[in-house]
Amino acid sequence: MKKIHPSAVIEEGAQLGDDVVIEAYAYVGKDTKIGNDVVIKQGARILSDTTIGDHSRVFSYAIVGDIPQDISYKEEQKSGVVIGKNATIREFATINSGTAKGDGFTRIGDNAFIMAYCHIAHDCLLGNNIILANNATLAGHVELGDFTVVGGLTPIHQFVKVGEGCMIAGASALSQDIVPFCLAEGNRASIRSLNLVGTRRRFDKDEVDRLSRAFKTLFRQGDLKENAKNLLENQESENVKKMCHFILETKRGIPVYRGKNNA
């Protein structure tokens, strides 16, 4: 059963799933698609061609789907946001719609946890199980792989790609691509280590050991791309292959490796 406060504004044409709750003074635009069991809390705004998956929560004064902060954007362009299931979008977060420079949509996978005051700009592509801590900000066209965690107060430069399973420490500033399963820290961020906490949560000991050996082979000595090419030969671990292919395909470059004890 839907529960819609009398002061909420639901534009004609909005599609609302079963058991939706829309609280006081919330706004839902005409082209939106809201899934089942979604809660839109007081004062939140859902705009443009936005889809929000089942069992999601949009907290007070978050704005999802407003036009991109891109001077080349034209109002007549098809533009929107697609968010998967089980998303949590906390207070005052902003998620802008896409542009014609992408496919017109900013996309976020399932199980996203986007904390207060985060900003996700136009055309960003976020995988599943992403966590953005308070005030993390993503510029246009940023890509985050599955299971990535971005610490609070961390900006990420436009077009940067962060691989699967990475941890970006709080108050860092990221301007280059980060290899899957790595931990990055600093302003500008450098690669510090394998993300051992994240990998141990997801993989068995043998796979974590393979990733640890791969990290040492890739970063401790020699040319990074040559190391990646050599490591790919007869490589059986799919996760190690992901690391190597990412290095070989990077467009913005990989930041230098600095161990945990090096500033």
From Swiss-Prot:
Cellular localization per UniProt: Cytoplasm
Principal subcellular localisation of the protein: cytoplasm
A GO cellular component entry from the record: cytoplasm
Biological process according to GO: lipid A biosynthetic process
Signal peptide: none
GO molecular function: acyl-[acyl-carrier-protein]-UDP-N-acetylglucosamine O-acyltransferase activity
Record keywords, A-Z: Acyltransferase, Cytoplasm, Lipid A biosynthesis, Lipid biosynthesis, Lipid metabolism, Repeat, Transferase
Pathway: Glycolipid biosynthesis; lipid IV(A) biosynthesis; lipid IV(A) from (3R)-3-hydroxytetradecanoyl-[acyl-carrier-protein] and UDP-N-acetyl-alpha-D-glucosamine: step 1/6
EC number, UniProt record: 2.3.1.129
Catalysis: reaction(s): a (3R)-hydroxyacyl-[ACP] + UDP-N-acetyl-alpha-D-glucosamine = a UDP-3-O-[(3R)-3-hydroxyacyl]-N-acetyl-alpha-D-glucosamine + holo-[ACP]
Cytoplasm among keywords: yes
Entries under InterPro entries matching the protein: Acetyltransf_C (IPR029098), Acetyltransf_C_sf (IPR037157), Hexapep (IPR001451), Hexapep_transf_CS (IPR018357), Lipid_A_LpxA (IPR010137), Trimer_LpxA-like_sf (IPR011004)
Coiled coil: none
Pfam family for this entry, one: Hexapep
Protein purpose: Involved in the biosynthesis of lipid A, a phosphorylated glycolipid that anchors the lipopolysaccharide to the outer membrane of the cell.
Subunit: Homotrimer.
Family label: Belongs to the transferase hexapeptide repeat family. LpxA subfamily.
Name recorded for this polypeptide: Acyl-[acyl-carrier-protein]--UDP-N-acetylglucosamine O-acyltransferase
Originating species: Campylobacter jejuni subsp. jejuni serotype O:23/36 (strain 81-176)
High-level lineage: Bacteria, Pseudomonadati, Campylobacterota, Epsilonproteobacteria, Campylobacterales
